[in-house]
Amino acid sequence: MKLTTEQTRKTWAIALYACILLVMRAGIARSGIAASLAGQLRPALLSFGLLLAPLWFFGFGLGEWLGRKLRSPWSRAAFPALLGVPYLVFAIPAGNVRWSTTVVVFLLPVVLSAVVESSASKRKMVWQDVVVLGALFGVYLLRLLMPDWPHAGLAVLPKLYVAGLALYLYVVIRKFDGVGYSLVPKRDAFLSGLREWVYFLPLGIGLGAALGFIHFHASVPFTASLLSGVLTTFLLVAVPEEMFFRGILQNLLETRLGQNTALVLAALLFGLAHFNTGASFNWRYVILATIAGIFYGRAWRARRQVLASSITHTAVDVVWWLWF
């Protein structure tokens, strides 16, 4: 039987997902994370795999498929409670189940889904969007879920939880136009992403050096380390952040404020999201991240592709990691 394009895409998505998990497992084994987790390595990897799954498979059409299958408001509101399962997968073997946390990680998706459901037919940003995005932004920015995965090496898991929930709310329930969340490789996405990276690079290096934020250092990592770093940056940093700040936030803001104002405001909020990185208020990082956000937003806006802005974001972060 000849496979259709959709079936081939699903097969590749599953195969690549398995490869990603193997690469991540190998990278963790070489790092100090494995030692710090001790006997909790397997539950941590399983929890990570479950939280990564929505971010990955929504990029290959899972969100649209769920939108067709979950027809009743009740089923759409109840389904995302499954996002709480990865917490139990990690906490139960560790004997560290916190019932207050369990209630939050299972109930928060249901409550926010119900709020979004009431605005699903609206094609512009409404007060429900402000409530939902504010809640998601607050949960992540204030690191409210960090104690639930209490290891430094697992800091990305709360981000994946929030990202998966945001995707579900705006792709499955809200079905908002123009999010552009697809991980299927496209030539124009790569060209748009690399173009904005080239535009930002001299400005970012010049301003970063002037502010004393970056300092040049030569670094040539092993090929395996470089590939692992690029993959990690793309999947765990660029994609979730670009999906939220560009595909959802900037997209919604455009419906009320117009393209240019939305671009600047989304970039400013993106910059402010980095205020607690390192210093108590890292104003240098906020300035540079805000300016970078302008170029990320331009990359997304060119063809409404999260992949494009994720490529720009990844390229910026990898250059910073390698040489600054």
Regions found by a protein language model. Give the residues of each.
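Alpha-helical transmembrane segments
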Residues: 8-26, 49-54, 74-87, 131-138, ...
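Hydrophobic alpha-helical transmembrane segments
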Residues: 130, 190-198, 227-231, 260-265, ...
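Membrane-interface helix/loop boundary segments of multi-pass membrane proteins
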Residues: 182-192, 240-265, 301-305
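Juxtamembrane "helix-exit" motif on the non-cytosolic side of transmembrane helices
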Residues: 24-35, 61-64, 86-96, 118, ...
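Membrane-interface helix-boundary motifs at transmembrane edges
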Residues: 62-75, 116-127, 151, 180-188, ...
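Juxtamembrane helix-loop-helix connectors linking adjacent transmembrane helices
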Residues: 141-237
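Alpha-helical transmembrane segments in multi-pass membrane proteins
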Residues: 39-49, 73-173
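Functionally important transmembrane alpha-helices
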Residues: 239, 260-324
